[in-house]
Every structure is written in structure tokens, then in C-alpha cells.
Amino acid sequence: MVSKLLKTITQPVRGLHQAAYLLASLTLASQVLALVRDRLFAHQFGAGEMLDLYYAAFRVPDLVFALVASLVSAYVLIPRIAGADPVESRRLISQTASFLFIAGGIMCGVIALFTPTLLTLVYPNLMQGAYASEFVFLTRLLLLQPIILGLSGVATSVTQVKRKFFIFALSPVLYNLGIIGGTVFLYPVFGLPGVGMGVVIGALAHFIIHVPVLMEAKLTPRFVIPDPKVLWLVMKDSLPRSMALGMGAFVTLALTALAARTGEGGVSVFTLAGNLEAVPLSLIGAAYATAAFPVLAEHHRKKQGVAYRDTIS
């Protein structure tokens, strides 16, 4: 029974529509869990100061993720490893994973050092509250997330190329389960930092589920000193997208800072509305795009123009 389940989970999904339906189904499950998560937050904290602090603590780590991880994201790696030589693919994955670990670690370390000052500048109202120390600790804890999810993003490039879409779609489900577990089990013991621990656990689960795919494909990254020439070949194509994502994250940070100035619950209402808005895009647009992209990348690499057009149509 267990072996049959594992075989189903790890089996490649070849058909485009089959992959899209699978992704949409698991995305729906993930979004339902996200709604359960938000409902738990509203029940546990209410749309007040504690929930404001939780959502506000994500904004700086999200900005780091947008600026660093998007430079070497799966969307840039997939066209380079789809149908490519395994040795070259592993070299590229090792280079990008090492860059993310080093650059993300340095940036997050510097921000962690100056977190109290930064939060006072961005969220002066929240830093004047009774939970300022917990807010600082939670933000520092969440700075682990960009590094972990960045590495997971590199791993998902292999998962998508190998068309293990069940595993790919399961990772955000595990992420939300980690947050829910942190809210239910760790918050009563540790308070608000306990929810942050759940976020980190969820991020680790998001990454770890891809490790067997990396091992099976013999593409497990090794720690190396990044080669600027290799990285530049990747980054030059991702700079426009990275700048757009970075600007989007910065705008969200600015809007969250403004929401924090409107009074208690402002950040919570703004964030919950944004979470609801993302549901239809994730269910429909992202599912087909995720399923089609590795197939299109492989057709392009192999110069299969007819197959490329057929997939799009």
C-alpha cells in the first residue's frame, strides 16, 4: 500500500492536461489549507495587533527572496537543464545553490543585525507596542525562509524537468501544514515566535520533499565557490524578472507600512484580502503555465518547432 502510494507520488506526469489538472487539484488543496490557516489566525489572534505583527514580519524576508532567489529561480534554470548533459546540469545547479546559500546568508545576516532599526523605520507604530521584542525575533526567524525557499526553488527546477508534478504541487501543501502546525501546537507554548517556527518547518518540508528527486536524477548540488561567469549567464536573463519581483515586493512592503499606520488590524485586513485575490490565479493560470513550461523548454532546446507550436495550441 505504502509502496504503491510512493510510486504514484513519484511517477512522472507526461500529459500536459493531466499535469495541469493535477497541479490545479493540489493547488486547490493548498489554497484551502491557506484559508484554514488564515481562519486559524483570525480565531487565534483576531484582526488585531498580533496578526498585524505576524504578517508585517514577512515583508522584509519576502523582499530578500524577491531580490536574491529570483536571480537564479527555476524559471531561468529549467530551459538550461531540460534535455541538457547531466554533468553540466549538476554543475549549474551546484553553482546556483551555492550562490543562494552564500548571498542569501550574508544579506539575511546583515538585516538580522539591524532588524530593530529597520523595523522602527518601516513600522514605527508596531515597534511602539507591547510586542516589539517578539516582532523583532519573529522577523529574524523568518529571515531563514528566503534561504530555504531559494534552495527549494533550485530543486523544483529538477522536479519540473523530470515532470514529477505531484511532488512539486505537494510542497506548498506541506508548507501550509507547517504553518498550521506551528499555530496549533507551538503558539500555545512559545507565543508568536512559535508560529514563526512553524513557517520555518514548513519551508524545510517544502525543500526536503524534492531531495529524493535530486538524488534519483543524480543532480544533488555540491557546495562550490560560485563562478561569476557561470552565474552571469543565468542572471542576465533573470534580471528583468528579478527587478519586477523586487519592485513588487518593495511596493507591498510600502503598502503594508501604510496599512500599519491606519490603526490596529490594518495590516491583517490588507494581507487577508491579498491572499484571497491570489486564489483564482494560482488555480487556473499558474497550473497550466507550470505544466507547460518544462515541456516548451525541452522542445526549444531540441529545436522541435512543430512540437513547440502544438504544445502551445
Feature-to-residue mapping (PLM):
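Helix-loop junctions and terminal segments of transmembrane helices
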Residues: 70-85, 286-303
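Alpha-helical transmembrane segments of multi-pass membrane transporters/permeases
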Residues: 21-26, 144, 155-184
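Hydrophobic alpha-helical transmembrane segments
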Residues: 171-181, 185, 189-216
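Interhelical loop/hinge segments that connect adjacent transmembrane helices in multipass membrane
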Residues: 2-16, 211-248, 306
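Interfacial transmembrane-helix starts/ends
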Residues: 17-21, 55, 82, 88-102, ...
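Interfacial/gating helices of multi-pass transporter permease domains
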Residues: 42-63, 233, 237, 259-279
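Short membrane-interface helical motifs at transmembrane helix boundaries
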Residues: 107-129
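Alpha-helical transmembrane segments of multi-pass membrane proteins
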Residues: 127-154
